């Protein structure tokens, strides 16, 4: 395929409508040599069917002296769909492995930004890209197929499960899920320089046996370049940061932190904290809890709104939003994440060392069924690059340091 630019896909097409400097990779990422001819060369296959039983045959390898290898996938069932396309579960006939295949319509003029991002990612809390291929239809439409690891559940469905039982989610699961969300965000924000822009329970996959969480759906993800505009109509409504509602175009990765704060609150409450019925109503829901933003806070979100007159509403105390038995550490963390001023929100890495997660650092911590927790402290050197020694010592408890043999504490 012609490498003309990175595709501004449907959810990500920026306000200019054209490929701008904001669509180019920042200088420091050029060293990573993102090329189409990586190990996962994208071959083109005919057909665009996702019905149960349909078999897709593609090839991988064949570059840099590697032998070509044929892989066949049998479509099993559709597991998700939206404006982007469709996600279906499939089985690799050669290995028996179950995978998820995300199929999106591809504009031939551009590289696909989601594919470019996925090729950079390698983290235990981020869904991994196995390989990719293109498929064509009779109408000569081109589809990109991302072959991803399959994770059976989502945080959204886990929340619904506990609601049906009329139970609160065990606090250890709330801690586990939220910790892993922040670890994935710290990685994509600090190591890759990418903002996800659609953090929500539906985009957080969970293995129901190990309770390992993986962030998925990078269809809206983007490298945010300081001084360059981005669209503000991004992120699902209940999880949308206030600066986006205010129409800010020069936002930061702090929008993901706000969304993660909303997810944490939802795990604790069993329902969304800010269930707005429209964009404006979303702001009303936020104001009902946080109170009217000050002039200074509005300036931090979008300087163009400072003269706008808002109804003066007092903040609702956090301890009245959560039930009396809620641990104060949980309430404290929510309050540090859901700040109007983006620069005052607790960054993802800082959130990991918050006392709310201390239970997970206990060497005797176990799942409610007595099993071990999923790996939480297996940090790679680049994850902790530039982090002060005292903070590293807190992030990697003594009993877990064998998971990081490169550490010299």
Curated annotation (Swiss-Prot):
The gene is ASK3. May mediate extracellular signals to regulate transcription in differentiating cells. Probably involved first at the cortical polarity site, to restrict MAPK signaling and promote asymmetric cell division (ACD), and second in the nucleus of stomatal lineage ground cells (SLGCs) or meristemoids, to limit cell division and to promote differentiation into pavement or stomatal guard cells, respectively. Phosphorylate YDA and SPCH in vitro. Roots, shoots and leaves. InterPro entries: GSK-3, Kinase-like_dom_sf, Prot_kinase_dom, Protein_kinase_ATP_BS, Ser/Thr_kinase_AS, STKc_GSK3. The keyword Signal does not apply. The lineage of its organism: Eukaryota, Viridiplantae, Streptophyta, Embryophyta, Tracheophyta. One of its GO terms (cellular component) is nucleus. Its main location: cytoplasm. The active site is at 198 (proton acceptor). The modification N-acetylalanine is found at residue 2. The keyword Transferase applies. This is Shaggy-related protein kinase gamma. CDD domains: STKc_GSK3 (cd14137). GO terms for biological process: meristem structural organization; protein autophosphorylation. The modification Phosphotyrosine is found at residue 233. ATP binds at residues 79-87, 102. It catalyses: L-seryl-[protein] + ATP = O-phospho-L-seryl-[protein] + ADP + H(+); L-threonyl-[protein] + ATP = O-phospho-L-threonyl-[protein] + ADP + H(+). Autophosphorylated mainly on threonine and serine residues. It comes from Arabidopsis thaliana. It is an enzyme of class 2 (transferase). Keywords: Acetylation, ATP-binding, Cytoplasm, Kinase, Nucleotide-binding, Phosphoprotein, Serine/threonine-protein kinase, Transferase. Residues 73-357 form the Protein kinase domain.
């Amino acid at each position: 395929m012609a490498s003309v630019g990175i595709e501004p896909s449907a959810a990500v097409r920026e306000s200019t409508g054209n490929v701008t400097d904001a669509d180019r990779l920042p200088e420091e990422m050029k060293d990573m040599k993102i090329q189409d001819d990586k190990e996962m060369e994208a071959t083109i296959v005919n057909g665009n069917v996702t019905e149960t039983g349909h078999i897709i045959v593609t090839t991988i390898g064949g570059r840099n002296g590697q032998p070509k290898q044929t892989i066949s996938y049998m479509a099993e069932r559709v597991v998700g769909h939206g404006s982007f396309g469709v996600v279906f579960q499939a089985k690799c006939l050669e290995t028996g492995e179950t995978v998820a295949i995300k199929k999106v319509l591809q504009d031939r003029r551009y590289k696909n930004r989601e594919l470019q991002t996925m090729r950079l990612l390698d983290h235990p809390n981020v869904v991994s890209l196995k390989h990719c291929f293109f498929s064509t239809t009779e109408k000569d439409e081109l589809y990109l197929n991302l072959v991803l690891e399959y994770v059976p559940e989502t945080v959204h469905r886990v929340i619904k499960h506990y609601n049906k039982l009329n139970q609160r989610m065990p606090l250890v699961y709330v801690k586990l899920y939220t910790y892993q969300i922040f670890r994935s965000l710290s990685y994509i924000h600090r190591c890759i320089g990418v903002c996800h822009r659609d953090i929500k329970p539906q985009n957080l996959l969970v293995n129901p046996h190990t309770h390992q969480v993986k962030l998925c759906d990078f269809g809206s993800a983007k490298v945010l370049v300081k001084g360059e505009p981005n669209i503000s109509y991004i992120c699902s409504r209940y999880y949308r940061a206030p600066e986006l509602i205010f129409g800010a175009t020069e936002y930061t990765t702090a929008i993901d932190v706000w969304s993660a704060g909303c997810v944490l609150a939802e795990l604790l409450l069993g329902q969304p904290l800010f269930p707005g019925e429209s964009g404006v109503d979303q702001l009303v829901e936020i104001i009902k809890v946080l109170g009217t933003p000050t002039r200074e806070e509005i300036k931090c979100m979008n300087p163009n709104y400072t003269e706008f007159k808002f109804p003066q509403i007092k903040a609702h105390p956090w301890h009245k939003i959560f039930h009396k038995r809620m641990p104060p550490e949980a309430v404290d963390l929510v309050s540090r994440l859901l700040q109007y001023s983006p620069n005052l929100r607790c960054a993802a890495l800082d959130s990991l060392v918050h006392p709310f997660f201390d239970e997970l650092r206990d060497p005797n911590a176990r799942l409610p069924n007595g099993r071990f927790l999923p790996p939480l402290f297996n940090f790679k050197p680049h994850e902790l690059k530039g982090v002060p020694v005292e903070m590293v010592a807190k992030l990697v408890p003594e009993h877990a340091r064998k998971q990081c043999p490169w550490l010299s504490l």
